[in-house]
Amino acid sequence: MGSSCFPQSPLSHSLFSSSSLSSSQFTPLLFSPRNAQKCKKKMPAMACIHSENQKESEFCSRRTILFVGFSVLPLLSLRANAFEGLSVDSQVKAQPQKEETEQTIQGNAENPFFSLLNGLGVFGSGVLGSLYALARNEKAVSDATIESMKNKLKEKEATFVSMEKKFQSELLNERDIRNNQLKRAGEERQALVNQLNSAKSTVTNLGQELQKEKRIAEELIVQIEGLQNNLMQMKEDKKKLQEELKEKLDLIQVLQEKITLLTTEIKDKEASLQSTTSKLAEKESEVDKLSSMYQESQDQLMNLTSEIKELKVEVQKRERELELKRESEDNLNVRLNSLLVERDESKKELDAIQKEYSEFKSISEKKVASDAKLLGEQEKRLHQLEEQLGTASDEVRKNNVLIADLTQEKENLRRMLDAELENISKLKLEVQVTQETLEKSRSDASDIAQQLQQSRHLCSKLEAEVSKLQMELEETRTSLRRNIDETKRGAELLAAELTTTRELLKKTNEEMHTMSHELAAVTENCDNLQTELVDVYKKAERAADELKQEKNIVVTLEKELTFLEAQITREKESRKNLEEELERATESLDEMNRNAFALAKELELANSHISSLEDEREVLQKSVSEQKQISQESRENLEDAHSLVMKLGKERESLEKRAKKLEDEMASAKGEILRLRTQVNSVKAPVNNEEKVEAGEKAAVTVKRTRRRKTATQPASQQESS
């Protein structure tokens, strides 16, 4: 174990010393902070390896301390001038090592091998002498390398000075170019500022115009709301009219249903009339049989026929009087036609009234004709019966029973006929009433339909005008959009030019700042290098210390460089952020300009819309005034027509009164005819009773008919008055 330790110790010492010298001389070239960190990381691993065997480490440490002490002493004596710092460090290190060796020697004084170790130390000192010679050779090599490094530093300084001169000349040229660019940019900036001022003035003018147009727009909006309210009222009136129409149509449907029911009843009554007529035909066949039996008695009653002819002449006279009265009615109709000609606007209502009057007249004439026919037939039958009774008075006595039965059946049939005639007349009156109500409802419906057509026509006109206005609005919008697009394009071009000029100015300013900072840093570095070179020339002997200082300076410079690089990166990031903020600001300005242009467009559109709405308002006012005039004229026409209708109703009542008078006169004439008949029949005593019975029946029939006519005229007059 001991023999193995001796030869290793001087070698390790020589290597340690040579490595320490080389590291002290070549640290700025070979080692870096990263290598130092790696070595520091490796040291604890080596310490762990050596701490495995404590006893062997103690012996080795003692031996190394001794050999180091012997090897360091001659080095300190020879190289005291060149390596003062190293000698001081080695002395400082040697003192604790000697103390440790002394302590170890004192601790191990009792060791019997100490004498052998001392001998071996002397032997090792000889070996160390040879190693010392090798160390001196290495020292000479290191001195040569130091001188070569100094020469290289001088060359680098010369190149550095030349680079500084070139850099300064380039900076001057760049400054001149930048000054020219700045002048140009200033001129462009002034031009852009002038453009901006003009644009601001235009914007202010547009803002004032916008405010004025907003006021006008608000006023027009108020007017539009008023017009909309008027339209809503018109729509409500339209809805009301439609509801009234629906009600009228419902009434018409109800009346039509009633008419259908009445027609069905009339048909039933006609069927019953046909059945009764068939029964009458049967009875008439029986009467014909009796007439064949009474033909012989006709010769006796020829005298009576002459008298009856005279009565007929009187009846014809009365009929002529009736015809004269009818001619007076025709004159009244002529007057009515003249009134209708004068009132052209109320033709429709007068035509309807004339139709009603003609229908009433035809109905009255038909009634009179039917009554006359019935009277003629009854008179003929009475004459036949009287002749038959005159000739066959004897047979009548025989056949009294049969005659009484026949008369009873005849009376029953007449009563049935009268009842059915009354029902038919009532139904006819109801039909007339329903027809009148239908005609009135139709006239109302026609008026309402005309009003609806007028309102629809007005609505269509308004819709057409609104569509025209919308087309004009769209055309104005397109033209305004084109103008706004052109203005936007010009503003965008100006904004782009402004942004480019601003960016160029900012870039030039930033480059100037960066160049100034770089120049300041370069000047500071030059000053530092000059001071360091002076120190190198003055302190050539203290090269090691200066190299250490330079190392520290290099480290600090590297730190400063890293710090400066970090600052540069930060400044770049801040510059990017500022550029982004500038871009955002420019975008916001562009958006503001766009919004201003959009507001200008909206104002122009609002102005155009307001003008169009004003035109619409004027048109609507004109149309409303025209409608009011038309409505007033229609009301006046309706009032005139109503007055005419009232006059015609009064004339109709007067005519009805005259007709009643004529009917009364007819009834009185019939009474006189009956009186004459009674006088004629008073000659024949046996037939008097039967003739009286028949005259009473005829009088009852005539009274009933007059009552029917009165009842028929009363509801008609009530309807006309209603």
Swiss-Prot record:
Looking at the keywords, is rRNA processing present? Answer: no
Residue intervals passing through the bilayer: 113-133
The UniProt entry's coiled-coil ranges are 146-679
Quote the subcellular location field of this record.
Plastid, Chloroplast; Plastid, Chloroplast thylakoid membrane; Plastid, Chloroplast stroma, Chloroplast nucleoid; Nucleus
Which superkingdom? Eukaryota
Chain ranges for the short sequence motif Nuclear localization signal as given in the UniProt record: 705-712
Stromal-side stretches of the chain, per the record, are 134-722
| Keywords noted in UniProt | Chloroplast, Coiled coil, DNA-binding, Membrane, Nucleus, Plastid, Starch biosynthesis, Thylakoid, Transit peptide, Transmembrane, Transmembrane helix
* PTM annotation: Predicted to be translocated into the thylakoid by the Tat system.
* Transit sequence range: 1-50, 51-84
- Offer a single GO CC term for the protein: nuclear matrix
The biological processes this protein is annotated with in GO are: starch biosynthetic process
Q: SUPFAM superfamilies annotated for this entry?
A: Tropomyosin
Q: Where is this region: Disordered?
A: 1-20, 687-722
What are the recorded GO MF terms, alphabetically?
DNA binding
Q: What does this protein do?
A: Required for the initiation of starch granules biosynthesis in leaf chloroplasts. Anchored to the thylakoid membranes with its C-terminus facing into the stroma where it is essential for localizing PTST2 and SS4 to the stromal spaces between the thylakoid membranes in order to begin starch granule formation. Associated with leaf chloroplastic nucleoids in vivo. Binds to various chloroplastic double-stranded DNA fragments without particular sequence specificity in vitro.
Partners and quaternary state? Interacts with PTST2; the interaction is essential for the initiation of starch granules biosynthesis in leaf chloroplasts, for the correct location of the process in the stromal spaces between the thylakoid membranes, and for the association of PTST2 with the thylakoid membranes.
Domain comment (free text): The C-terminal part is necessary for DNA-binding.
Could you identify this protein by its name? MAR-binding filament-like protein 1-1
Question: To which species is this protein native?
Answer: Nicotiana tabacum (Common tobacco)
